[in-house]
A protein has these predicted regions:
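Catalytic cores of nucleic-acid ligases and guanylyltransferases
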Residues: 1-266
Length: 266
């Protein structure tokens, strides 16, 4: 079974002024294409074609109940508990997929949000709303297999998703077909949180890039940086990030502002 090229969302900064959109929470994990071939074997690939099925433990086994010749588009996520809340754990996803750590496989979950082929039929040309219906009918929901939640798009609903710990939302046109590559009929809106930290050092990394080391309330935070930041060591900077991971690390963190004045710190 050939590996389909996934459809990708386009990042947007402004909310759509008009039009009919549906919304899904933006999970923070690894994109995974899961396929059931004509022999009933279940296989899984990353969006770049790396085979990952042997690193996921028993997670994919229930998918064998789906019709043969079916391909699901999913997000591989890990969930942890903190202070009674269930939170996403991207670091654990990396340990499973990149390092092959079998011990963390039981923490993995699969969230399905689209179906590309169903019982040998290519359903990508169908509108999203029809594919969503087929997905609900064909995806075998289980303890660690779930369907993405969909609802009409609104700013209020987006803000509620961010408050729940999601890194944002994905908006989709109900009539959109599934096309490979980045498309404007799928738009992602990421949350941006901000915090003030002290710039402690600027150092080159092993990859040749420059990184800034910051202190955020006694916690060490490393962000992409540049040599010019060396003149600002000891000063306050503003950090921007999308969410806090289960281990307390900041996802997609960067220095968004320097030269803060006392009024900025009040």
């Amino acid at each position: 079974m050939p590996i389909p090229e996934p459809m990708l969302s386009t990042r947007a900064a402004t909310w759509p002024a008009h039009g009919d959109w549906m919304m899904e929470p933006k999970w923070d994990g690894f994109r995974l294409l899961a396929a059931i071939d004509q022999r009933g074997r279940v296989r899984a690939w990353s969006r770049r074609g790396a085979s990952l099925g042997d690193r996921l433990g028993s997670l994919l086994e229930p998918l064998a109940a789906a019709p043969r010749g079916t391909v699901f588009d999913t997000e591989l996520v890990a969930l942890s508990s903190c202070d009674g809340r269930v939170i996403q754990d991207f670091a654990t996803v990396c340990r499973a997929t990149l390092q092959g750590d079998a011990a963390v496989a039981p923490k993995l979950h699969l969230v399905a949000f689209d179906v590309l082929e169903l019982a040998g039929e290519d359903v990508r040309p169908l509108p999203w709303v029809k594919r969503a219906e087929l997905l609900r009918e064909s995806f075998p929901i289980g303890d660690r297999l779930r369907l993405v939640h969909t609802q009409p798009a609104s700013r209020t609903a987006h803000e509620k998703l961010v408050a729940l710990g999601f890194e944002g939302s994905v908006l989709k046109r109900p009539g959109s077909s599934y096309r490979p590559g980045r498309q404007t009929t799928w738009r992602k809106y990421k949350a941006t949180h901000r915090a003030t930290a002290t710039l402690c050092a600027v150092r080159p990394g092993r990859d040749g890039d420059t990184y800034a080391l910051c202190d955020l309330g006694g916690r060490r935070v490393t962000t992409p940086g540049s040599a010019r930041l060396g003149a600002l060591i000891g000063q306050q900077v503003e950090l921007a990030y999308s969410r806090v991971d289960a281990d307390g690390s900041l996802r997609e963190v960067r220095i968004s502002r320097t030269g803060l004045e006392p009024r900025d710190l009040a």
